[in-house]
């Protein structure tokens, strides 16, 4: 077997920003105590991976990107009890240590052991398990799935149903859960309410699905790419608007569409500061809630009129849909297996891992929702 040995395998490496990923052979060290080595079988391409490549989301390079995935445990380090070799698993970019303030709180889900904000690009012990040509490679947000094998901390992996199709449930590792949870878990959308979703990519469409599941009576999709509208309507949007079709700001358009009231809930699923303030301004001045779901660029700051908040609006962020990862991912996989929701409409392309750069080109061109790479 491979347990306890260095594994040589294929990975896509980001050596520098604004360059295609490079598929090369890397060495993956065995897991240390409380770590798990996973054979990745399916991984989705998410806009957040592209934000690192573009330089918008600052991370230390070289790095093995990818964070939306599913696979099988190859081996475990000393002291690991939550999974065993052969288990089907999903790596978690939001860990759940069970001990920190966020994990202990019923209201929190962003475990403080996450590497989203610190951006060290390393394992919790401050080292890497990846090398290429004698050079150490960084890990990406506790996961790194653009590789045949990865190593994660035991707080960043969870066992799922052995019968689950990994090429579909990999989306529960990020895109689906992030959007769906923003509606049902973070916003707690109420039946009969009106929602607006800004950005109709994979996460935005999942937010649309969440609004529908929560019983929203109107779900307005907002995107400057009208090619996204048919799919949004298929997923539950009752109408779609393109801000480029109007002379007035989109928040005024949404007020007009709601009889001057504004929407009950708005979701910004793009990651732009201008659309974040527009989404806030689109919701009801008193009890409206706006959720920031899109990953904001590292360097950006936001300016807005405090009057927007003073009247009673709520502005809230949501990471991984507000779900506590270890508690929720297995349950979401079970719900999928029980056909409580479908992931098929989100997966527009399936391709071999070697075509990863083509997958990113489809994303940038607005031609895909989710591309799933198979090893």
Swiss-Prot record:
GO molecular function: all-trans-retinol dehydrogenase (NAD+) activity; zinc ion binding
E.C. designation(s): 1.1.1.1
InterPro entries: ADH-like_C (IPR013149), ADH-like_N (IPR013154), ADH_Zn_CS (IPR002328), GroES-like_sf (IPR011032), NAD(P)-bd_dom_sf (IPR036291), PKS_ER (IPR020843)
Modified positions (N-acetylglycine) in chain numbering: 1
Ranges in a coiled coil: none
Subcellular location: Cytoplasm
Cofactor note: Binds 2 Zn(2+) ions per subunit.
SUPFAM superfamilies: GroES-like, NAD(P)-binding Rossmann-fold domains
Disulfide bonds: none
Gene Ontology terms: biological process: retinoic acid metabolic process; retinol metabolic process
Organism superkingdom: Eukaryota
Source organism (scientific name): Saara hardwickii
PROSITE patterns hit by this protein: ADH_ZINC
UniProt protein name: Alcohol dehydrogenase 1A
Any further remark recorded for this protein: In U.hardwickii there are two isozymes of alcohol dehydrogenase I.
Homology family: Belongs to the zinc-containing alcohol dehydrogenase family. Class-I subfamily.
Subunit composition and interactions: Multimeric (with different ratios of monomers).
Binding, NAD(+): 199-204, 223, 228, 293-295, 370
One term under GO cellular component: cytosol
Co-factor(s): Zn(2+)
